Amino acid sequence: LKTLQRNPDIVWRVEKRRQQAVLDRLKAGEDISEEGTVILLLSGMMHQLNLLGGEIWTLCDGQRTLAAIVDILHQEFAVERAELEADVQEFVDDLLQRGWLNYAKSTD
């Protein structure tokens, strides 16, 4: 099984207070799609990931497959599974292409 892992050269952190504020706004029905909750530092550049992107990034720990990540997120977010799966796949494909994620080497 192909598990996803973050590029170890990328320094990152979860902005906990900001994440909680974004979650509160989400519960209130506000649009939070542009709100960054995870900060990545790469080649002197700072990048922000929104709530869903940050959750995906955090779950790419080398232990989980794409399907396992979708399963976890489907329990957290009130979204149709097929739509969520397509969004996660698109996001992961983008990060794979950028070299920010890769597939963990199989230990089998």
Residue spans of the language-model regions?
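Acidic, low-complexity/disordered tracts enriched in E/D and polar residues
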Residues: L1-G54, T58, A104
